[in-house]
Amino acid sequence: GDVYKRQELDGETDYAVANVAEEASVQKAINKTLEKFGKIDIVLNCAGIGSASKTVGKDGAHPLDYFKIVLDVNLVGTFNVLRLAAVEMGKNEPEKDNECGVIINTASVAAYDGQIGQAAYSASKAGVVGMTLPIARDLGRMGIRINTIAPGIFDTPMMAMASDEVRKPLIEMTQFPKRLGNPEEYALLAM
């Protein structure tokens, strides 16, 4: 199907759906964005996958293919999107403070405080945190600002797949408020 979907928010925003781990898919989404707007001002990287898998569980060793795909989507995919978007942002006319674009990556509290079974997810999100500063230094010369947000536990489609047995202890571990975050709160933080 078509990798590009559109939802009008205020006439000046849109989003593109792509397989972030595939260069051609991301480039197609970028091209569609350029067709509509003529430039890219902001990218919000939110792609992420993961589920619990112990290093050694009752079925044996953690599947290596699973570990690799989590890193492919969460870490390599984040890098793939930002590097291709940065090419286009570098063509923008500088605005206030000579800024040509903004990239916001999504990590996770798991980058700093991973739980049992989160080796792949935590490693991928720690990688997002770890690459942010060197990339910010690299892209700063082009007027591109890059930041990473490491949210706690949010009520996303990925979390919705978890059983109540998994969700309940996670909610109990939160400090305040005693609930999962909602996507609207994250959107307000990012914007």
PLM ranges: what are they?
Residues G1-Y4:
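Short, small-residue-biased leader/transition segments that mark boundaries at the very start
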Residues I49, G60-N80, I104, V128:
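Catalytic Tyr-X3-Lys loop
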Residues G50-K68, V87, K91-D97, G117-A120, ...:
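Conserved mid-core segment of classical short-chain dehydrogenase/reductases
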Residues V87, R137-D138:
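Alpha-helical segment proximal to the catalytic Tyr-Lys
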Residues S108:
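Residue(s) in the substrate-gating loop at a strand-loop-helix junction
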Residues T148, L170-M191:
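C-terminal helical subdomain
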